[in-house]
């Protein structure tokens, strides 16, 4: 089929095979002879005309992106042929088209009185956040643009700070909802929220305090049933906790452990502790506490294997009996939850410290954010596979989140203060880069929080549910964007 629209300047025509993986957007298979000067806009118009997505038909045109050999077409077809085929205009070009990912649109900002350390959008309509103010907060997205008031503010029983957070109870559970936060105090604090209704009279409380680590908690995740919690730590270990069906009546772990932080268990200190009465640790005394602890529980299993800190955890989205961990030792490891056995090992370069990990539900591929300013993809379906693709960034990546339905897009947060949305079919550059500091909603005069904490630019957390994207970090704010990503 030859395309020569009226009024267009004479141009050489190239044989193009247009195809898509979306049945609803498919056009008849044919070789289209298309002017070499055409770019994305003209190609998108052609697809919409064939599909009948025109104003005459009462339909709104759909914007499309076009990929050639796995990379987004960013110029004309002629420019691509000159660059990649040495000017060969006779061979057919296979061009895949996909619905465009629209630029994220900032909707709101919520100020937090300290650095934001963790974010979760796993429960629709709400964002769960943890901060170094030692708070866990629940924010309703519907009211975020008008008010920064949290629906619940849950204080940790320590002033050392919260490092991560997760929803524990499944979406279907509407009462006695469990949430969890990992802390610098080596513990994971699990809270029970009576209801997310603002009219609830009952107050939330800390139900469990999970012990067992010797370093700060770096990541906390929960199973889809809400019955199990897994934590990763700077001590290199991964702990599994099985929550009881009914509230217990006694503790599994004694109160007031001797030391909470790395470096406090030195030989000299242990000798002094033999001669002196045990004293409360600074930051964990009753006077500094902001709440009461829950039932103290020990781990049901400890998974060992990492030779450095555990950077992040993700529950396998295709196999509920498996979890994945990424570590500062450059490895990604798969673990069987029931036995605690290491079922898979992907060892990358030892200097490629992984700070976080997430997984695409569509194909099981893992994505890690790394200290060496890269995002790495790992194919979990091949036992001997290492890094299958690397995306370059400008600074370390402490948080990544894969799109829940698209197998190609993900979002990342970086230490340089930017949020990036990627399409792995075009891995050289991000589709969109958003700087929180340069946003119209940013307050240039806010240098410190009300409690005197100095603010910075590094982002520490990002999450994306396919419709809403949130990010936060040292700037003491949660940025909220509308972003579909399909």
Swiss-Prot record:
Pfam families: NLE, WD40
WD repeats: from-to residues: 212-251, 305-345, 349-388, 392-432, 454-486
Record key words, sorted: Nucleus, Repeat, Ribosome biogenesis, rRNA processing, WD repeat
PANTHER family: RIBOSOME BIOGENESIS PROTEIN WDR12, WD40 REPEAT PROTEIN 12, 37
One biological process term in Gene Ontology: maturation of 5.8S rRNA from tricistronic rRNA transcript (SSU-rRNA, 5.8S rRNA, LSU-rRNA)
Domain of life: Eukaryota
GO cellular-component term (any): nucleoplasm
Region (Ubiquitin-like (UBL) domain): 12-99
Full protein name: Ribosome biogenesis protein YTM1
UniProt function note: Component of the NOP7 complex, which is required for maturation of the 25S and 5.8S ribosomal RNAs and formation of the 60S ribosome.
Family the entry assigns: Belongs to the WD repeat WDR12/YTM1 family.
Localisation per UniProt entry: Nucleus, Nucleolus; Nucleus, Nucleoplasm
Main location, first listed in the record: nucleus
Region (Disordered): 249-299
Gene encoding the protein: YTM1
Subunit structure: Component of the NOP7 complex, composed of ERB1, NOP7 and YTM1. The complex is held together by ERB1, which interacts with NOP7 via its N-terminal domain and with YTM1 via a high-affinity interaction between the seven-bladed beta-propeller domains of the 2 proteins. The NOP7 complex associates with the 66S pre-ribosome. Interacts (via UBL domain) with MDN1 (via VWFA/MIDAS domain).
GO MF, one example: ribonucleoprotein complex binding
């Amino acid at each position: 089929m030859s395309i020569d629209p009226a009024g267009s300047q004479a141009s050489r025509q190239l044989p193009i095979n247009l195809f898509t993986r979306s049945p609803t957007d498919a056009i008849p298979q044919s070789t289209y002879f298309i002017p070499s000067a055409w770019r994305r806009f003209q190609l998108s118009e052609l697809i919409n005309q064939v599909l009948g997505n025109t104003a005459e038909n009462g339909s709104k045109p759909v914007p499309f992106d076009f990929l050639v050999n796995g990379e987004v077409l960013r110029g004309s077809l002629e420019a691509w042929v000159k660059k990649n085929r040495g000017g060969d205009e006779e061979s057919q070009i296979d061009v895949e088209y996909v619905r465009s990912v629209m630029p994220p649109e900032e909707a709101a900002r919520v100020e937090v009185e300290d650095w934001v350390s963790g974010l979760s959008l796993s429960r629709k309509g709400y964002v769960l956040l943890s901060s170094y103010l030692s708070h866990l907060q629940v924010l309703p997205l519907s009211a975020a643009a008008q008010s920064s008031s949290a629906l619940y503010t849950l204080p940790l029983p320590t002033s050392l700070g919260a490092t991560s957070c997760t929803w524990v109870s499944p979406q279907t559970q509407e009462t006695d909802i469990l949430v969890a936060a990992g802390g610098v105090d080596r513990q994971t604090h699990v809270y029970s929220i009576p209801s997310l209704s603002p009219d609830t009279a009952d107050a939330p409380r800390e139900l469990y305090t999970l012990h067992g680590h010797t370093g700060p908690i770096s990541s906390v995740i929960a199973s889809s049933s809400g019955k199990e919690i897994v934590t990763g730590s700077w001590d290199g270990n991964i702990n599994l906790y099985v929550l009881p069906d009914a509230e217990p009546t006694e503790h599994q772990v004694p109160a007031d452990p001797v030391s909470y932080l790395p470096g406090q268990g030195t030989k000299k200190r242990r000798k002094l502790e033999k001669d002196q009465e045990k004293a409360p640790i600074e930051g964990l005394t009753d006077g500094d506490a902001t709440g009461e602890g829950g039932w103290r529980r020990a781990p049901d299993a400890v998974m060992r294997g990492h030779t450095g800190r555990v950077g992040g955890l993700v529950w396998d989205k295709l196999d509920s009996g498996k979890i994945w961990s990424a570590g500062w030792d450059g490895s990604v490891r798969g673990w069987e939850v029931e036995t605690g056995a290491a079922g898979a090992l992907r060892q990358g370069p030892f200097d490629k410290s992984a700070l976080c990990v997430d997984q695409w539900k569509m194909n099981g591929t893992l994505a890690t954010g790394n200290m060496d300013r890269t995002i790495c993809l790992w194919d979990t379906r091949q036992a001997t596979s290492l890094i299958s693709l690397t995306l370059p960034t400008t600074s370390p990546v402490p948080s990544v989140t894969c799109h829940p339905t698209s197998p190609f897009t993900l979002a990342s947060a970086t230490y340089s203060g930017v949020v990036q949305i990627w399409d792995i079919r075009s891995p050289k550059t991000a589709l969109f880069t958003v700087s929180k500091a340069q946003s119209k909603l940013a307050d240039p005069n806010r240098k410190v929080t009300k409690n005197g904490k100095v603010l910075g630019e590094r982002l520490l957390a990002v999450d994306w549910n396919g419709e809403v994207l949130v990010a936060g970090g040292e700037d003491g704010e949660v940025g909220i964007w509308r972003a579909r990503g399909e």
